[in-house]
UniProtKB/Swiss-Prot annotation:
Record-given protein name: 3-hydroxyacyl-[acyl-carrier-protein] dehydratase FabZ
Gene Ontology molecular function: any one: (3R)-hydroxyacyl-[acyl-carrier-protein] dehydratase activity
EC nos: 4.2.1.59
Keyword Repressor carried by entry: no
Function: Involved in unsaturated fatty acids biosynthesis. Catalyzes the dehydration of short chain beta-hydroxyacyl-ACPs and long chain saturated and unsaturated beta-hydroxyacyl-ACPs.
Coiled-coil segments: none
Subcellular location: Cytoplasm
PANTHER family: 3-HYDROXYACYL-[ACYL-CARRIER-PROTEIN] DEHYDRATASE
Species for this entry: Actinobacillus pleuropneumoniae serotype 5b (strain L20)
Principal subcellular localization: cytoplasm
Active site: H60
Keywords: Cytoplasm, Lipid A biosynthesis, Lipid biosynthesis, Lipid metabolism, Lyase
Length: 154
């Protein structure tokens, strides 16, 4: 996945208050803090600040906290949801964006309190109501996770 950003253009930012209008998730499960840039129908970059106050750290692992990989994947899926809404418009009152499948998930290094996750998700294709994306998560420019995701809006 290579996200190509045109030179001399202002990044498109979406703050958390707007993200909350796009996604139904709330604390403690809203895992996208800010969109730092995107291009409708193509790609999106977002961040998640990992703090020691995350509820998951009470059990994963109290003496040596590591942000769970499944939550990295969930945050990546939420980033695809923001891209889908930014591309296709707001969801209807009774509509949800479902995480349908995941393939080729790989975890490269642990994520710990104090890290800032940067997600890059890219639209691949849409077929019969299922949208396929590829995603990567980075900390300090180093790959921590990658996966192919499928989501459905119903």
């Amino acid at each position: 996945m290579t996200i190509e950003v045109q030179e001399n253009r202002e990044p498109k930012i979406i703050e958390v208050t707007e993200i909350m209008k796009m996604l139904p998730h709330r604390y403690p499960f809203l895992l996208v803090d800010r969109v730092i840039d995107f291009e409708e129908g193509k790609w999106l970059k977002a961040i998640k600040n990992v703090t020691v106050n995350e509820p998951c750290f009470t059990g994963h692992f109290p003496e040596s906290p590591i942000f769970p990989g499944v939550l990295i994947l969930e945050a990546m899926a939420q980033a695809t949801g923001v891209l889908a809404v930014a591309t296709h418009g707001k969801m209807a009152q009774d509509e949800l964006y479902y995480f349908a499948a995941i393939d080729n998930a790989r975890f490269k290094r642990p994520v710990v309190p104090g890290d800032q996750l940067t997600f890059e998700v890219e639209f691949l294709k849409e077929m019969r109501g299922i949208t396929k994306f590829t995603g990567k998560a980075f900390v300090d420019g180093k790959l921590v996770c990658e996966a192919d995701l499928m989501c459905a809006r119903k």
